[in-house]
Amino acid sequence: MCKYFCIFVPDLILQAMKNRFFLFAMLLSALPLVAQVHITMDDPDTWSAEVLRPYIGQTVIFDMPMIVCTNVNSNYTVSPWRRFQPESHGFKGSAEYNETVRINNSCMFSISGISGYHRCGEKIYNLKAKVNSLTSLTWLGGTWHGNTRAELNAGLPDLGDYRLLVCGFNLENYYMTLNSMGAKTASDRTRQQKKIQQALEHINADIFGLVELQQGDTAVKVLVKKLNDAQLVAPGDNTPRNYKYFHDAAVGTYQKVEFVYDANKVAPIGTPVETNVEVQNRKKMLCFRELATGEKFIYSINHFKAMNTGGAERRENEAKAVMKLYNSYRQNHSIRESDLLVMGDLNCYAYTEPIAVFVEDNDMLNLHYEFHADSSYSYMYGNMASYIDHAICSTTLFEQITGMSAYHINSDEDDQYTYDKSTDETMFRCSDHDPVLVGLKLDSTLVYDPAPIINTADIFRGDADKLLIKNAHKSGGQRSFYAIYTVSGLLQDKKEITSALFEVDLPQAPGVYIVYVYHDGVAYQRRIIVR
């Protein structure tokens, strides 16, 4: 009996232990898991990377979208907000300038483990990451959204119901001769031409104002021939494109600006006039007449002195020279026109003295600001977004502008996709500057109304997916817009308000959003929406 017992007791104990382990495992599986740490942004004015300090070494999920701020050789940084050059938001020393500096310094995370190629400006929803330090994350998961190459290939930015499309575009040293400024090898030059040509054909503008072209006719002649060989047609009426350019007397190895226009849509009145203050061949002006309506406007395309070639007073001199030329040119008996559109690479940020010459001294309107408040950019420098490629108009022209936007095919791209560093032949990163687009619906009977939009605009929810904006539109006068931002300041949607009762689709992702109604770059109504 004892022998029997001694043989079988260990087996019974082992079986009991197995059963208990199974029951213990079942109990563990039934218990709720430790809640995942979610990082939120309750107050954007005070939020910083310090909130992550307790979670170093742990995994967290960011409830607010994170945005790609830099992408250099597949090395990425992300932040809850886009980093801007401070002078894009305010003059040095102003509250806006200082706030931009604070935001830029509040947080920036390098992030490893991202697969595939992503552009600056792409957003990551529900980013799951390991916190390595207050400046370093490791990717564990998330959903990418927005600003992809596919979206940009699908069409141009929304510019409203325009009849004429005007494009200002710095081509980044478009030369036919091989030299240190442009392409250095024949294969690089061929690839540069293909990339530029794809961009110009995709934009398909009625008038191009081109910057950084080789002096003389060789470069522009090749470019225009390729455009016409593409057999493009004008959107809407499908009129065949017939691009022309001007044979100027500029010779040499340096750069110039140039007009390229569709002779089936517009006619130049005479030939371009220019001012050579500070630098030659880089400030031209011409009046165009729309063939369909007979309406006219003056187009000024420019390339001001670079920031590293003298103080801001030199670019201020250039701005004054442009206005002096305009005030003389518009009095010409064959012109008699006040509608002015100034575009080009002015090599200065929005809140600097050269721009103040136009906006403050001559009461012109900064279209980046009018249409996009403080979210506009066309260029990246020092890992910060900004715009030095401007679109500024006279008040007499403003009501005839249906829309304006930079087309972000270049500034958000990794530098590794340039024509001289890759075999990529797409339009992306064909230049270091984004083309800037302006839609025109010329009508000289329209009158600019500088009065602010009345504060009776109302924002309220429709159904679960809709937002209604009431009394923010005035027919025949002021133009107003709405913009939807996340609480972290990421722009989700923005369009013109075109009716007295205007319906807006809310973003699909759940979260907290701030909706603005604004006019003349100033918000007049704001509402927080929880989705």
Whereabouts are the PLM-identified features?
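Sec-dependent N-terminal signal peptides
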Residues: 7-8, 21-31
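C-terminal outer-membrane/trafficking sorting elements
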Residues: 8-10, 452-531
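Extended non-catalytic accessory segments flanking core domains
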Residues: 35-179, 187-194, 275-280, 315-320, ...
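Metal-dependent phosphoester-hydrolase catalytic domains
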Residues: 38-47, 51-55, 62, 119-152, ...
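Beta-strand-turn-beta hairpins that frame and shape the catalytic cleft
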Residues: 158-166, 264-267, 280-306
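Active-site metal-binding loops of divalent metal-dependent hydrolases
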Residues: 171, 212-213, 302-304, 344-346
